[in-house]
């Protein structure tokens, strides 16, 4: 991936996404692409209400808590009540180390997922923490350095910045591919395009 300027990710003989390494890693269009390159946590939830339409920030309710994410554009903004899927890279997960000590933000709301630490593994300078949310979903967090003060069996709050979460599996994600396919199909049946 670090030697390529364009990458095509295929799934069962179909292109999932074509883009630069940065686009593939940081802005995956589908959950398949998000998990194909690197470690990504895939979460599902229901859109509550857009928190701020000016910056495309929305609040999503999961069974383990509320999280905030940014939609890429106004056109990509899901509607309240819509079920959505988000991807969050393992290195972007942060911890509130004790749910008893969590303070709400300026509005008194606490955003994040409540989860129990089930595994803590050191690999050189990296710490890998596996957690299980209250609804049974596994979350993986990767931290560099050994200063993360969480212990196996402890319940913590998993948090991330809205800008670190990506909406995936949106209907618009494959719109260009479908248009291109229709054009190719049209060319093959008509012998080309006409102006």
Regions found by a protein language model. Give the residues of each.
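Short, glycine/charged-rich "phosphate-handling" switch motifs in NTP-dependent
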Residues: 6, 18, 27
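Catalytic metal- and UDP-sugar-binding loop of GT-A-like glycosyltransferases, i.e.
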Residues: 9-10, 88
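Short acidic-hydrophobic catalytic motif
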Residues: 22-26, 34-37
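Residues located in well-ordered beta-strands
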Residues: 20, 32, 46, 114-117
């Amino acid at each position: 991936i670090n030697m390529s300027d364009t990458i095509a990710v295929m799934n069962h003989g179909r292109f999932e996404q074509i883009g630069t390494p940065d686009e593939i890693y940081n802005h995956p269009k589908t959950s398949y692409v998000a998990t194909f390159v690197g470690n990504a946590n895939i979460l599902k939830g229901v859109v509550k209400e857009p928190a701020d339409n000016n910056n495309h920030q929305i609040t999503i309710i999961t069974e383990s808590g509320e999280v905030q994410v940014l939609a890429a554009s106004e056109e990509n903004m899901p509607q309240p009540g819509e079920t959505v899927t988000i991807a969050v890279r393992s290195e972007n997960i942060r911890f509130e180390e004790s749910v008893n000590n969590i303070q709400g933000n300026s509005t008194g709301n606490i955003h994040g997922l409540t989860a129990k630490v089930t595994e803590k593994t050191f690999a050189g300078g990296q710490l890998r923490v596996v957690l299980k949310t209250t609804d049974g979903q596994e979350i993986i967090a990767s931290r560099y350095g050994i200063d993360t003060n969480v212990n196996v069996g402890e319940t913590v709050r998993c948090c991330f910045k809205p800008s670190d979460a990506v909406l995936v599996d949106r209907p618009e994600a494959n719109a260009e591919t479908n248009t291109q396919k229709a054009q190719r199909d049209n060319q093959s049946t008509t012998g080309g395009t006409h102006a």
